[in-house]
Amino acid sequence: MAVDSHDYTFKVLLVGDSGVGKSCILTRFTSGIFEESTTSTIGVDFKVKYLTADGKRCKLTIWDTAGQERFRTLTSSYYRGAQGIIFVYDVTRRDTFESLEANWMREFDIYSTVESAIKMVVANKVDLSAQRQVSSEEGHDFARRHGCLFVETSARANLAVGQAFEELLLKILDTPLLLETTAVGGIKLGAVPTGQQAGVCSC
């Protein structure tokens, strides 16, 4: 199958404070590498990844947004048309966890144009257990209260990074309204068959 042949295109947005590891998560997922030293994202960056789920080949355009305050007005425009939103915090910095509710989820509520968008909370840097300031239970409870999926990851240790995107994709595919959002970025070329066992592969 040609690289650009796919059944669906979905837009996924990574948001969170500067330094929580959004760019590292994205690079780990799309390129399979971890970059120890990365510069802060200026404005927005994006990468493309193809996954096959439930027999459907999906193109994910994953947008990595700047976490700095001075880029907030620029970042806001990128919420539009996103079928998936990943809120990332650093488990070793409680302020980044608290910022999800105080800042990022508020922005999502204001700027998102896809009512059924799937939300996920990702707790990153869990390999730094000795420095942890936010417990797993606290992260789970927060995600549940806000109607989000929840995954703990480590881009450095390559822990559950792929799992996070795979779970998000399966949930998107399981939401019929998101398969019909052609006007806001989702391209529907076929219906997802029912009754198939869930499964995801990278290709």
UniProtKB/Swiss-Prot annotation:
Q: Where is this motif: Effector region?
A: 38-46
Q: Where in the cell is it found?
A: Cell membrane
* UniProt similarity note: Belongs to the small GTPase superfamily. Rab family.
What GO terms fall under cellular component here? plasma membrane
Q: Modified residue Cysteine methyl ester is at which positions?
A: C203
Which PROSITE patterns has this protein been placed in?
A: RAB (PS51419)
- Any idea which positions bind GTP? 16-23, 64-68, 124-127
The protein's topology relative to the membrane is: Lipid-anchor
What gene name does this entry carry? YPTV3
Q: Which InterPro entries match?
A: P-loop_NTPase, Rab, Small_GTP-bd, Small_GTPase
UniProt-recorded name of the protein: GTP-binding protein yptV3
Q: Which UniProt keywords apply?
A: Cell membrane, GTP-binding, Lipoprotein, Membrane, Methylation, Nucleotide-binding, Prenylation, Protein transport, Transport
**GO-annotated biological processes:** protein transport
* Alphabetized SMART domains for the sequence: ARF, RAB, RAN, RAS, RHO
